[in-house]
C-alpha cells in the first residue's frame, strides 16, 4: 500500500496461531465427537465489498446515499458516489476493506451408535454415525469466511473475490467390522 509515495504493510495473511481441539466421548455404544478450530491473527481483504461499493450496489453505499453522503473524519460530508468510487477503486484505500482474519468454528460434529455384536450374531460390529462439517462459525471478525480461498496459488490467499459461501455438509457413516 502506498501513502505519499511510501509503502506500508497492511498485515500478513498468515495467522499468528492455528488452534484445534478434538474430543471423542463414548458411553454404552454411543459416540460423540467434535472438532473446534480457531485461527488467531492474519488479515484478509474483501475485493467483493470494494467492487460492490465502487459500482454503488452495496448496502453501505445505499445507506450513504440515503444519508446524503459519507462523513469523513467526523467533519466533512462527501457525496456517497465520490467516496465509494474512490475507496472502492484499485488505487483507492485497501485498508478500508481489510479485516482481521481471526475466527473460531465448530469444524466437525459426529454422533454415532455401535450396535451390540449379539444383534449381528457375534459376526460383526456395526456403527452408524451422523457427521457434519463446517457447522457453526462461532466468531469471525471479517464479513466473510477468511479461510475460503478463490485459488490455491500463493498470490490469492486471504482475498475474497466474489467467492461462494463456505459449504456446510452433513453425512452418514456406516462402519462394519468383521
For the regions a language model picked out, list residue spans one by one.
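Repeated loop/turn-to-beta-strand initiation elements of outer-membrane beta-barrel proteins
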Residues: 29-34, 118-119
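C-terminal beta-signal and terminal closure region of outer-membrane beta-barrel proteins
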Residues: 57, 67-75, 89-91, 139-178
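Membrane-embedded beta-strand positions of outer-membrane beta-barrel proteins
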Residues: 34, 128-130, 174
